[in-house]
């Protein structure tokens, strides 16, 4: 998918954040194998973990200021309005009720992302929500200032709250690095203790004591999400490492279990280590076909239980059942029926069935999706974050995408691979432009291609959406670093138009293209094994996906970024076709030339000027899938030579200059990108993770020296970075007249916080989140010292 957050995650030595996620953002993977059982048995529950930092080892103020620079949100943090008022007002009352209840389900489900972020994230959310719910911001501001807090520090407190609410936790949805407040611990504590919530509710003080050190902790493990000892994750218990994930994933593959809906906790029972694979569900009891009793595999013990996120999923299902009453047709009703069963039982098959009804629901007035969808933030690349969205179809803007779909089967022929590497038949998807009412999770994308289930996408179909009111918030005013004045002018004029083209091509013909070569349980191949050649080597095909293997499980840690790179490359490559640009309304050759140039320039600029923010120089890890993908494409085009791309340091330690020779895009650029794209597709089709990893790691390398010392230049890029936009979303409510009302908010820090206060107008949700943390804390002893 194509995320606008600039476009929101590579962890560990396997650069994990790069797991397949079909969306476009705004802004060495080992194959699964059996590991010696001694690894598991030698790791007790509290075995030699790097603990969270605590108050005794926090840096001193001067050191802290420098250390936190990359982790704070500035007081100038921009907030923008996700405007959907006119689109919402055009709905019928029945449609508004459907949108309202589905939005409620999405918001409640989106809170699961807090639990999936860090052990402390739900408590930080609860602390801040209780504080702002108890009194108006101007009242709290007056009390804080009277207590000696500066106006700037109070603003920093508000900005931190915005960051936690917007990212569903205290780690960035785009990049997975920690967010810490841009004010001192002392001033933060002063504000908390000045609040009415602190005075009136004893539990607020208790919550604060639990999280105050965790809020500011910036030891190396706290800086990013990932496996111990290099990061924090809640998809796995504290004592799980990359090696544990390989043990668990090997067992899951042997059982044909996809891990989208689960977390894994390594516990000790009766002196034995057990991997408890826990499914998200309302039900907790055992059920044949879903849970599994304790069993041994390769010397390790496993079981599947359920009941994770129970109370939140109960709320989700209650709202979905209300939405079902206002469904427009059988497709929507059946879709919801299966979603409810999925969340009740912890059944991935039921969610797949719901997704099948969803793809049949062509051209709905209201588009929705909900569930455990995207796998960016799991260090192992398989467990999915919960999200849900509700949006209204913009028929006028959708027309161009419909034409793209109608011609897609022919347009795919422009891609550089041969027919055997393409799907047997093209399944025309729905492709619409939407105005988002609700997008709950750790960030808001600009475009989406779902479902992510391989067997449905390849054999049954999928949908693409472009989120128009998200695209409308692209910044076209501020200076653009590292470009000439002429290029800045062109970028500002054509960036949105070019981005819309890239979104469309990335989603429909990027994620929507290509075939996976498989052998099934009966030994039947889904491709002509005798006559299909490897386009890279010219030799017969010798690798393919085995029964039980999926792209996700095979490509694991690099999968997300690798797939985003493939889709981005498809977008660039096909944007050279003028008949495609005409579909988007660009018929004048001079305008087409500018669209092509700006599309290529923009992606290359993102790859060199923005992406490096998402590289961690300590761990040498990429922290974000799309950023790594763009850096890789930039390196491919830079290495193509012949003056196509040039990057030079114009002011030592201060500035860079990027130039792209537009006269060579259609020649040097086309060939270099076509050759690279062919390799990307061949390695994906043939499940050749070894060749894919070798190539991808080469282009992902951030050099310390040489003609392009990217590691050194990263500091220059960080000095020029701009904060990512936070989008304030409307709320819906049913009035006394039983009609749905839309409530919008000012695009300010105060307005954004108010939207969350009114979204949850009492502390019930805080009680619920706190109870989940209490239940789970035994799995995360390093956070809670238990």
From Swiss-Prot:
Q: Which reaction does it catalyse?
A: Release of an N-terminal dipeptide from a peptide comprising four or more residues, with broad specificity. Also acts on dipeptidyl 2-naphthylamides
Name the residues annotated as catalytic in the UniProt entry.
Answer: 507
Name under which the protein is recorded? Dipeptidyl peptidase 3
Sequence ranges on the Cytoplasmic membrane side: 1-108, 616-786
Kindly give the Gene3D superfamilies that the UniProt entry links to this protein: 3.30.540.30
Recall the GO molecular function terms of this protein's record. aminopeptidase activity; dipeptidyl-peptidase activity; metal ion binding; metalloexopeptidase activity
- Looking at the UniProt record for this protein, which Gene Ontology cellular component terms does it annotate, in alphabetical order? cytoplasm; cytosol; membrane; plasma membrane
Family, per entry: Belongs to the peptidase M49 family.
* Function (record text): Degrades neuropeptide proctolin (RYLPT) by cleavage between Tyr and Leu residues.
**Source domain of life:** Eukaryota
As cofactor, the record names: Zn(2+)
InterPro entries, per the entry: Dipeptidyl-peptase3, Peptidase_M49
- Which terms does the UniProt entry file under GO BP? proteolysis
Q: Which organism is it from?
A: Drosophila melanogaster
What is the free-text note on the cofactor? Binds 1 zinc ion per subunit.
């Amino acid at each position: 998918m194509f995320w606008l957050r600039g476009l929101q995650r590579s962890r560990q030595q396997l650069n994990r954040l790069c797991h397949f996620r079909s969306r476009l953002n705004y802004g060495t993977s080992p194959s699964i194998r059996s590991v010696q059982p001694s690894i598991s048995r030698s790791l007790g529950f509290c075995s030699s973990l790097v603990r969270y930092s605590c108050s005794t080892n926090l840096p001193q103020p001067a050191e802290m200021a420098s250390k936190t620079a990359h982790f704070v949100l500035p007081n100038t943090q921009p907030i923008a309005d996700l405007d959907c008022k006119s689109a919402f007002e055009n709905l019928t009352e029945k449609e508004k009720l459907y949108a309202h209840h589905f939005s409620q389900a999405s918001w409640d489900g989106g809170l699961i992302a807090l639990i999936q972020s860090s052990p402390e994230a739900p408590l930080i959310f609860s602390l801040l929500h209780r504080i702002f719910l108890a009194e108006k911001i101007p009242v709290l501001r007056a009390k804080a200032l009277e207590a000696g807090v500066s106006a700037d520090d109070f603003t920093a407190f508000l900005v931190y709250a915005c960051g936690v609410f917007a990212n569903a936790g205290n780690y960035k949805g785009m990049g997975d690095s920690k967010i810490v407040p841009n004010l001192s611990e002392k001033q933060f504590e002063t504000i908390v203790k000045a609040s009415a919530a602190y005075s009136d509710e004893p539990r607020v003080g208790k919550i604060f004591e639990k999280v105050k050190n965790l809020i500011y902790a910036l030891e190396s493990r706290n800086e990013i999400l990932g496996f111990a000892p290099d990061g924090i994750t809640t998809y796995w218990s504290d004592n799980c490492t990359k090696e544990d994930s390989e043990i668990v994933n090997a067992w899951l593959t042997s059982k044909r279990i996809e891990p989208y809906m689960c977390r894994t906790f390594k516990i000790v029972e009766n002196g034995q280590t057990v991997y408890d694979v826990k499914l998200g569900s309302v039900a907790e009891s055992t059920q044949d076909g879903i849970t599994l009793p304790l069993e041994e595999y390769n010397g390790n013990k496993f079981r599947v239980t359920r009941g994770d996120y129970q109370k939140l999923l109960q709320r989700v299902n209650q709202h979905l059942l209300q939405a079902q009453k206002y469904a427009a047709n059988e497709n929507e009703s059946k879709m919801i029926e299966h979603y409810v069963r999925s969340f009740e039982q912890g059944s991935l098959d039921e969610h797949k069935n719901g997704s099948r009804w969803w793809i049949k629901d062509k051209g709905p007035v209201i588009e929705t999706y909900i569930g455990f969808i995207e796998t960016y933030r799991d260090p192992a690349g398989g467990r999915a974050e919960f999200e849900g969205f509700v949006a209204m179809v913009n028929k006028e803007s959708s027309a161009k995408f419909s034409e793209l779909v109608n011609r897609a089967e022919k347009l795919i022929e422009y891609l550089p691979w041969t027919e055997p590497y393409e799907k047997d038949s093209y399944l025309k998807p729905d492709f619409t432009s939407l105005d988002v009412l609700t997008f709950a999770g750790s960030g808001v994308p600009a475009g989406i291609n779902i479902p992510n289930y391989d067997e449905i996408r390849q054999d049954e179909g999928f949908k693409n959406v472009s989120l128009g009111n998200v695209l409308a918030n692209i910044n076209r005013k501020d200076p653009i670093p590292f470009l000439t004045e002429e290029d800045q002018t062109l970028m500002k004029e054509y960036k949105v138009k070019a981005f819309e083209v890239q979104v469309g091509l990335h989603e429909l013909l990027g994620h929507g293209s290509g075939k996976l070569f498989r052998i099934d349980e009966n030994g039947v191949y889904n491709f002509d094994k005798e006559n299909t050649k490897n386009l890279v080597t010219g030799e017969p095909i010798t690798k393919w996906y085995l029964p039980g293997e999926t792209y996700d499980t095979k490509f694991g840690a690099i999968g997300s970024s690798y797939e985003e790179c493939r889709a981005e490359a498809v977008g660039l490559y096909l944007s050279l076709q003028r008949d495609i640009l005409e579909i988007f309304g660009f018929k004048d050759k001079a305008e087409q030339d500018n669209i092509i140039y700006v599309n290529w320039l923009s992606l290359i600029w993102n790859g060199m000027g923005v992406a490096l923010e998402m590289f961690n120089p300590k761990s040498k890890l990429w922290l974000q899938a799309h950023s790594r993908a763009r850096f890789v494409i930039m390196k491919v085009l830079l290495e193509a030579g012949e003056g196509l791309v040039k990057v030079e340091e114009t002011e030592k330690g201060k500035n860079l200059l990027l130039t792209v020779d537009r006269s060579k895009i259609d020649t040097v650029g086309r060939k270099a990108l076509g050759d690279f794209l062919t390799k990307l597709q061949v390695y994906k089709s043939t499940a050749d993770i070894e060749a894919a990893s070798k190539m991808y790691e080469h282009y992902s390398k951030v050099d310390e020296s040489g003609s392009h010392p990217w590691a050194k230049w990263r500091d220059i890029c960080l000095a020029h970075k701009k904060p990512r936009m936070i989008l304030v979303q409307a709320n819906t409510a049913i009035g006394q007249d039983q009609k749905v009302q839309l409530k919008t908010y000012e695009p300010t820090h105060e307005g954004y916080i108010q939207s969350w206060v009114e979204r949850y107008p009492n502390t019930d949700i805080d009680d619920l989140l706190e109870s989940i943390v209490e239940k789970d804390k035994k799995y995360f002893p390093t956070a809670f010292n238990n």
